[in-house]
Amino acid sequence: VRSRCMDKDVPVNVILPQEYSDTMQYPVVYLLHGYSDKYTSWSREGVVGRLADMYNFVVVMPDGGYDSWYFDSPVVKEYRYETFVSQELVSYVDSCYSTIKDRKGRAITGLSMGGHGAFYIAMKHQDTFSCMGSLSGGLDIRPFTKKWNIAGRLGAYEQYPERWEENTVINMTHLLTPGSMNIVFECGTGDFFYKVNCNMHDKLLKEGIPHDYYVRPGGHSWTYWLRNIKYQFMYFSDCFNKKTK
């Protein structure tokens, strides 16, 4: 997909349900990969393809770069993945496929860096998405200032603490109002992001924001993500079928 804002072509993997027909309009799940992965990463073992068939979803998996964290980076101007995913990609998908061209038919989720990205993009673009999810997401990046080149996207924490404070998902809950988004997230108890996910859950509870939060045994691994992505799709299916938000 050509990104005008980044002036480059971005690889995107699109899975259509087996019964796809131009006479129907389908909900779309935008599925984001993690740090060091790429647009093909979620395709492993055919799990997502089977879920697309089961729920009749179009699934869109963009390349988020090795370490973009899905920000519009103030440091590296050619990293504008928030704008790409929320605007250019959605526009492209709606023009090329028979989709529900409304927030009620769009969800966004991802794993790890992509879980952060999904929450980050959805919270800032609630007019575009009605559902947001995360598996093992980095929902608070502040404890990890030296990790995964986040500093390469935001600048060093020591120099630009305000950028880290403004762009960590856990500090963005003021953008939500009760019922404004359908929210589902989960994390394994053995995951290094477990504590920040629990903190996010506690903060949403305190602020009266309805959400589903699941904790299961497991670590930061493809075994965990491939086993549990089905619960996100189940949740999105329920939301799309209600069509209330």
Where would I find each of the regions flagged by the language model?
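Non-catalytic cap/lid and distal C-terminal segments of serine-dependent acyl enzymes
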Residues: 1-245
